[in-house]
């Protein structure tokens, strides 16, 4: 991972984009020679590791940086499915059951929040968040939701203190009430791929 002198992830994202672009080129050149299943295996071998490696750390950046990776992901999905250059990719992601960069980030945050909610994290992390019922005693429908930390800057919005409660509060209760981590992960995947 690359971190520059201004503590931004721009150099790392440039590196990831460069590696993904090479792999997209390989997928594009082989698009008419390999089956969809084989190209999907190539995607998960050549591209997916660059997107997921320490994603929860470096993906907390500006959307403009992540959009570069997302556009390369869209090119890769078009190559896997032999779609036209301007084909709409949302149905292709769903058909192939591939998560885009934003959904991968959401999944990572949801997994962290599940561990927090079920006290599976080290003691250092146990007092990061408060539920609304801990802040006030009113019986509201959002009493069980985590309180979102107020932010004055965009940099704070990139932190887990802000993103964690936002993601957790958006999940349906049938998912957040689960106690098994593998089941939770599968249900969140289904929720994101809808």
Language-model regions, residue ranges each:
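Hydrophobic/basic alpha-helical segments
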Residues: 1-194
């Amino acid at each position: 991972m690359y971190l520059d002198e201004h503590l931004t992830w721009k150099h790392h994202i440039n590196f990831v984009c460069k590696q993904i672009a090479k792999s997209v080129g390989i997928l594009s050149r082989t698009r008419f020679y390999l089956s969809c299943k084989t190209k999907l295996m190539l995607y998960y071998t050549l591209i997916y590791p660059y997107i997921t490696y320490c994603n929860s750390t470096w993906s907390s950046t500006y959307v403009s940086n992540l959009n570069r990776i997302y556009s390369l992901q869209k090119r890769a999905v078009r190559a896997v499915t032999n779609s036209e250059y301007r084909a709409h990719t949302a149905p292709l992601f769903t058909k192939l059951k591939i998560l885009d960069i934003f959904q991968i980030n959401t999944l990572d945050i949801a997994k962290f929040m599940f561990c927090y909610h079920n006290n599976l994290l080290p003691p250092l992390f146990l007092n990061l968040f408060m539920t609304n019922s801990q802040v006030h005693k009113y019986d509201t429908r959002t009493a069980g939701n985590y309180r979102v930390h107020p932010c004055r800057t965009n940099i704070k919005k990139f932190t887990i203190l802000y993103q964690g409660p936002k993601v957790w509060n958006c999940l349906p209760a049938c998912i957040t009430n689960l106690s098994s981590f593998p089941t939770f992960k599968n249900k969140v995947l289904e929720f994101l791929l809808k």
